[in-house]
Design a protein with these regions (language model features):
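N-terminal presequence-like segments and adjacent domain-start helices
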Residues: 1-8
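Amphipathic alpha-helical interaction surfaces in cytosolic regulatory modules
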Residues: 11-35, 40-89
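Helix-rich interaction surfaces within compact, conserved domain-sized segments
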Residues: 92-96
Length: 97
């Protein structure tokens, strides 16, 4: 079973560290018992640092296979998908999220 985490309340842009930290906390709490579907409906942009904090942290806390088994994305734009990928890459390159 997966729980949907809607990011529409943060739309149209997720750019502050405070928002990213709140989203990360919510996702970590849900991941204790459920898989997640992250719904990006109405989100047009996300800062790379926000993606690094949220998805880089989660990616580094589990292996790649587990990350993609437990976290799915819907309603993403090509820009959002690229930002998520870059956030994960930057987290891995820096050695910390």
């Amino acid at each position: 079973m997966s729980k949907v985490i809607s990011l529409s309340s943060y739309a149209p842009s997720i750019g502050s560290e405070e928002k990213a930290a709140e989203i990360l906390h919510n996702m970590q709490t849900v991941l204790e018992s459920d898989n997640i579907v992250v719904d990006f409906e109405n989100v047009q942009t996300m800062g790379t640092n926000c993606a690094k904090l949220i998805f880089g942290t989660l990616y580094k806390s589990m292996d790649a296979e587990k990350f993609y088994e437990r976290i799915n994305f819907i309603h993403t734009t090509p820009n959002i998908r690229r930002t998520i990928r870059l956030g994960i890459e930057f987290a891995l390159a820096s050695g910390k999220a």
